[in-house]
Amino acid sequence: MTDNSAPAPETKSGPRVALFVTCLVDLFRPSIGFAAVKLLEDAGCRVEVPSQQVCCGQPAYNSGDAASARRIAKQVIETFTGFDYVVGPSGSCMATIRKEYPAMFKDDAAWDAQARALAERSYELMSFLTDVLGVSTAKVHFQGHATYHDSCSGLRSLGIKEQPRRLLSAVDGLTLTEQQDSETCCGFGGTFCVKYPEISVKMVSDKVGNIDMTGADTLLGGDLGCLMNIAGRLRRLGKTVRVYHAAEVLAGMADRAGIGDPETR
């Protein structure tokens, strides 16, 4: 994703927000990052994208490599110091910063206060828009019948459930239908799908079955890892359900191929 770290114009007086792009968005779906910037700027924020940002450290942390996770976390803390807020389009990454960073440094006097300060200023995108900025409208059109997938980290660690639905319900032309077991894991789980592929395939197959039962033509969600995993299974099974990050729809930027689809679609 193109760097946008230059200071915002002085004419803007809104909060200074740093976008935590996330590895997956940067590498596989930069449009989500651009959608996040648009949503934040439309809400009055001065958005910057620090070019030196790195991974949140979650893969290392979840794999038991505490030393590497702490080293990466220190880079993140240093990079995002000085902003009013840090916002990311992923419940998974932002839960790591909000919940795990304070735990990583609770016995480290040199970093404890900084880790807690960053955690308190960090938010998942949908939560930030609704809970902090008070956004309740979406002045865009998206024609489709969608169902929403709740990511485990966003739901269980950050309590994100109604926020994206509230925003999406305001989108003209969009119908939302809840799927059975919407809160059940899709089987991605970061490194989980690599360590336990057979279990992961069974879980995502069940998820696809639940999506099928809704009759929806579109799947929406707030974590690219989950969406890529589900989209991959949908395509392998020959399903035509479109897959988008909620930010793409809310920003009016879902006029491109869905996640997992050829760009020529």
What annotation goes with each model-predicted range?
Residues 1-265:
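Iron-sulfur cluster-binding electron-transfer modules in prokaryotic oxidoreductases
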